[in-house]
Amino acid sequence: MFGNDIFTRVKRSENKKMAEIAQFLHENDLSVDTTVEVFITVTRDEKLIACGGIAGNIIKCVAISESVRGEGLALTLATELINLAYERHSTHLFIYTKTEYEALFRQCGFSTLTSVPGVMVLMENSATRLKRYAESLKKFRHPGNKIGCIVMNANPFTNGHRYLIQQAAAQCDWLHLFLVKEDSSRFPYEDRLDLVLKGTADIPRLTVHRGSEYIISRATFPCYFIKEQSVINHCYTEIDLKIFRQYLAPALGVTHRFVGTEPFCRVTAQYNQDMRYWLETPTISAPPIELVEIERLRYQEMPISASRVRQLLAKNDLTAIAPLVPAVTLHYLQNLLEHSRQDAAARQKTPA
């Protein structure tokens, strides 16, 4: 009955329509994902019967009214979402969705990367892209019995990050560092990467890798179809580490993964515990990886953290920040504050 169906694109700024979408998602046991930039809705006889959204290169919030399931509408909606993403210059697409929608997106050319059985699947619109990416990593492979890996945000890069890298590199024949690639953090990705490259230039046997979509960002991980936070965290950990262990680690020959101890964030502390299971469990058909926790570097009896640096930056307290970060980071933060002051002064001078 597609002839009477109306497909509409809805921006986040359209409050009335967004309220209708939120209600429809709620009726389908979903919620609005805050990262979605634009939705496509399907209405029939002025009633909302389906919707889906685009967040960057990720398809999210797909819901089909139970009354119209089986009509083929889902396939049409998925095609419209893919076309919209392409128009927005996103051609490398992912979807995190309920297990029940896996077959639907297979019909649209998506392939399953990994899954949390019975809960969710992660798919992309290629059957070979992840394998090609893993293959491309092999040129960075180095010989040795102990090959380490660190994954970090460095938001911003601190003396604590540098200490972890130094300690891990000293224990390994080679160390690989991946920087999580997302710009929803306080500092742009390219800035964070530049600080890490400059701040580790003197550390031997280290390769700093640009992040990729296959190093999963917690910031972009969807939670709109999972109600319990503990289940969200579990799914994130399982998805992230299955991809790492099955594809990325074998390409580089990684035998050990290093993390800092986590005294502050309960979620990260639990992630470290769960990481040990997913890196070592024999249920995954990939070589096990040993998790190594390194005690966090302290300053005046307190572990150094990026969150503490961000708190101090909000207070413009560069004096307190100075002993917590490398010189390259301090210089960057000084420039950041100076530009903020100049922008504020310029706004004050601009007539209303």
From Swiss-Prot:
InterPro entries: Acyl_CoA_acyltransferase, Citrate_lyase_ligase, Citrate_lyase_ligase_C, Cyt_trans-like, GNAT_dom, Rossmann-like_a/b/a_fold
Keywords from the UniProt entry: ATP-binding, Ligase, Nucleotide-binding
Highest taxon, organism lineage: Bacteria
Transmembrane intervals: none
Record GO biological process: biosynthetic process
Function as written in the Swiss-Prot or TrEMBL entry: Acetylation of prosthetic group (2-(5''-phosphoribosyl)-3'-dephosphocoenzyme-A) of the gamma subunit of citrate lyase.
UniProt name for this protein: [Citrate [pro-3S]-lyase] ligase
Matching NCBIfam families: cit_ly_ligase, cyt_tran_rel
Lineage, highest ranks first: Bacteria, Pseudomonadati, Pseudomonadota, Gammaproteobacteria, Enterobacterales
Segments forming domain N-acetyltransferase: 1-128
This enzyme's EC code(s): 6.2.1.22
Induction pattern: Repressed by H-NS. Part of the citCDEFXG operon.
Single GO molecular function: [citrate (pro-3S)-lyase] ligase activity
Principal EC category: ligase
CDD domains in UniProt: Citrate_lyase_ligase
Coiled coil: none
Reactions catalysed: holo-[citrate lyase ACP] + acetate + ATP = acetyl-[citrate lyase ACP] + AMP + diphosphate
Pfam annotation, one family: Citrate_ly_lig
